[in-house]
Amino acid sequence: MRKSFYTWLMAQRNPKSNEPVAILADLAFEDSTFPKHTDDFEEVSRYLEDHASFSFNLGQFDQIWEDYLAH
């Protein structure tokens, strides 16, 4: 079974980085309602589009998701 996206994303945290994955990781870490136990693209994407307490470029999210799938 694949690690959840959130678990993988937390390994990408780096407050000193300007890389999109590090920025998303920090934003997700601060968002208590971010879906933490899923590896489903649609669920995470829908959350970012409709419910996130922050704004993030969804084009960058697509690339981050591809990186997640590659690991």
Curated annotation (Swiss-Prot):
List the protein's name: UPF0346 protein stu0441
Quote the SUPFAM superfamilies the UniProt record gives: YozE-like (SSF140652)
State the similarity comment: Belongs to the UPF0346 family.
Source organism of the structure: Streptococcus thermophilus (strain ATCC BAA-250 / LMG 18311)
